[in-house]
């Protein structure tokens, strides 16, 4: 029985493949200076990082296409249901041998991963676009202004440099969270 069609597999591997390259190149941009220069030297590091930066910036768009396509294909199958509560109560069958809790197309664990990837992927994509086009976006000022309309009291008067600093921080935190979650997804 074929569970997923060609378009489903294409969407998954477009998103997954680009994510792996984005994770490696992003980690290199963040930590490579400290880890790779002692191993390869400054010249080799500069070449690796320059190529990695271009790959990171261009493959980001492949990730966004994979993310959007995955949302269109699978969002309706990932709406939580009462059956998911039963699946969660049984621990997904991980703790008892031979126990396989009922689920529809996707179980509750897969649904959690799906929504975390959709929300985290959208968030990291938006902050990534803001980083690629500096001084042209005000993602944090705009987001904080919207939150202020529902009762928060957050600052909205950021300089362009402060916006970029917040984008870098957010991009790194969300990316690390996604990498951690995807490692767990692959392992389980």
Name these PLM-found stretches.
Residues 1-188:
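Membrane-embedded alpha-helical bundles that constitute the cytochrome b-like, heme-associated redox core
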């Amino acid at each position: 029985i074929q569970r997923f069609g060609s378009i489903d597999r294409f969407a998954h591997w477009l998103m997954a493949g680009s994510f792996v390259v984005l994770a490696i190149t992003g980690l290199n941009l963040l930590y490579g200076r400290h880890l790779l220069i002692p191993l390869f030297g400054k010249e080799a590091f500069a070449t690796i990082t320059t190529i990695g930066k271009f790959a990171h910036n261009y493959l980001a768009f492949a990730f966004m296409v994979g993310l959007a396509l995955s949302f269109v294909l699978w969002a309706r199958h990932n709406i939580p249901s009462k059956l998911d509560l039963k699946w969660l109560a049984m621990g997904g069958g991980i703790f008892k041998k031979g126990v396989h809790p009922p689920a529809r197309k996707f179980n509750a664990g897969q649904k959690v991963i799906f929504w975390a990837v959709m929300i985290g992927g959208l968030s990291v994509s938006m902050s990534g676009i803001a980083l690629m086009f500096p001084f042209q976006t005000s993602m944090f000022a705009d987001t904080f202004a919207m939150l202020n309309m529902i009762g928060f009291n957050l600052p909205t008067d950021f300089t362009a440099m402060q916006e970029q600093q917040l984008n870098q921080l957010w991009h790194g935190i969300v990316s690390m969270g996604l990498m951690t979650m995807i490692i767990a997804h692959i392992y389980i």
